[in-house]
Amino acid sequence: MKIVKEALAGTAESSDLMVKIAPAAGELEIEIYSDVIKQFGDQIRRVVKETLAAMEVYEGLVIIEDKGALDCVIRARLQSAVLRACEAQPLRWEALK
């Protein structure tokens, strides 16, 4: 999926996260800010990369502001932001697991 506009998903509440996504030329850039980065940073990054790969997102800027979200919340918020940022492209529903 090609990111064509900026999009947001999520909140800055406890146990949630805010996902900001924007178009960018070149490779995918992921920035993660988290209160629990030392304990769970590797897992957060893994979930983000797996979700973006499943949705075939290979370019863009993704900023994650995490407040202790579970993996399922990270996936859902990221999927929402990507779908909003892709606008009218045909959706591959099977990629949303």
UniProtKB/Swiss-Prot annotation:
Q: Can the keyword Magnesium be found in this entry's annotation?
A: no
Q: Name one GO cellular component term.
A: cytoplasm
Protein's name in the database: Citrate lyase acyl carrier protein
Annotated disulfide bonds: none
Post-translational modification O-(phosphoribosyl dephospho-coenzyme A)serine, affected residues = S14
Q: Which domain of life is it from?
A: Bacteria
Which cell locations does it reside in? Answer: Cytoplasm
Relate the assembly described in the record: Oligomer with a subunit composition of (alpha,beta,gamma)6.
Lineage of this protein's species? Bacteria, Pseudomonadati, Pseudomonadota, Gammaproteobacteria, Enterobacterales
What is this protein's function?
Covalent carrier of the coenzyme of citrate lyase.
Task: Please give the organism.
Answer: Cronobacter sakazakii (strain ATCC BAA-894) (Enterobacter sakazakii)
Main subcellular location: cytoplasm
Q: Which InterPro entries match?
A: CitD (IPR006495), Mal_deCO2ase/Cit_lyase_ACP (IPR023439)
Keywords per UniProt: Cytoplasm, Phosphoprotein
State the similarity comment: Belongs to the CitD family.
